[in-house]
């Protein structure tokens, strides 16, 4: 439920009535007088520090005065001028791409990548990868296997088989039965 707000004026103050407007103006002036007297009352405790105005660079002022489209062009020109004498962030000249070989400066020839074997020098030829059989280099030629050298040490000739266990040829197929006592395990 809505109740009318009581005011000091016994007549209803509606919009556009001059008596209400004048009363509001009087109240506003009275409030201002109270504020100024209160401010004088506490003025000894409040200290105002003078603000120091700082002047901006004239370069920024020119950017503010130019039109929106023109300022974009000026920014692009500044970027181009900035890169003329300087190289890129990873040591390659401006205008070149990372794929041109300027990605890092680790001593590799241009156009090569880390995967081509220039990350460290593990003893394999340049341009080969770890998967090409050059993972370790203990003095053997690349591609040789340790097992081949072990087989050579066993002393098998060309006429003998490299498999040292006796092969059982199917004697049971010919009708002769074998017992487990006849099969001898090899001497180790």
From Swiss-Prot:
Biased composition (Polar residues): 94-107
Modified residues (Phosphoserine): 37, 121, 180
UniProt cross-link Glycyl lysine isopeptide (Lys-Gly) (interchain with G-Cter in SUMO2), position: 75, 184
A Pfam family of this chain: DUF5568
Organism: Bos taurus (Bovine)
Keyword line: Isopeptide bond, Phosphoprotein, Ubl conjugation
Signal peptide: none
Family: Belongs to the UPF0461 family.
InterPro entries membership: DUF5568
Full protein name: UPF0461 protein C5orf24 homolog
